[in-house]
From Swiss-Prot:
NCBIfam families: aroE, PRK00258.3-3. This is Shikimate dehydrogenase (NADP(+)). It catalyses: shikimate + NADP(+) = 3-dehydroshikimate + NADPH + H(+). NADP(+) binds at G135, V136, G137, G138, A139, I236, G260. Homodimer. It comes from Streptococcus pyogenes serotype M28 (strain MGAS6180). The gene is aroE. One of its GO terms (biological process) is chorismate biosynthetic process. Its EC number is 1.1.1.25.
Amino acid sequence: MSERLSGHTLLVSLLATPIRHSLSPKMHNEAYAKLGLDYAYLAFEVGTEQLADAVQGIRALGIRGSNVSMPNKEAILPLLDDLSPAAELVGAVNTVVNKDGKGHLVGHITDGIGALRALADEGVSVKNKIITLAGVGGAGKAIAVQLAFDGAKEIRLFNRQATRLSSVQKLVTKLNQLTRTKVTLQDLEDQTAFKEAIRESHLFIDATSVGMKPLENLSLITDPELIRPDLVVFDIVYSPAETKLLAFARQHGAQKVINGLGMVLYQGAEAFKLITGQDMPVDAIKPLLGDE
């Protein structure tokens, strides 16, 4: 990267903590090199206490954009000038664009687009499909919004203590009003309803942290009768590459099992385009993710 750096190099950042596990610097810097773009991508260990100063730094230094991850995806909202329609619905941001470096910051959420592009890459369409989605944190909400925007017939959301999540209930109401998709919210502790939903679904999406450390030995589905030859199972966790859920689904004959690496790639590609105006060379970047 040092050969590419110059007095004209444009900086893109990542604001999150922890950041050491992030695939983003490798992805974006390799993409800049492939396209000959005079950009550099750096990760900064920033939590909510330093976030306001960091955002002011984006404005002051003319940083062209930033990715935002935990714990800053919701905390950054009041620090921005505008939000995309999806980010406003979700109530979270993972990409900030500083157009022309002039300090007007617009927040976007690319998690949903990334998930849907990952599914499409595997030949999975969500249009007119019934989908069960577990976990309605920032990523889960973004995926739910994109599923509705892309024409899913029905989305059955499940989350622990779901009835206490007023923000999610508001999202459900808005999606039912704004789209033709039927969206419902139920408690994940209601295993009868959860199992019934999966039995009637074409696609099950796990957007919880179950399956990654320290929960790597757990799975939301443990009943083999729930796994059918026409069921697609998508776990947004990418490390480990095969979670216990995906291994269980594969062993019991699911139509297809998909991990979160594709979502990482395509949400990054969408952020890349928002900031640079260029398409990320995803075919060249995809092999890098397999090294992890």
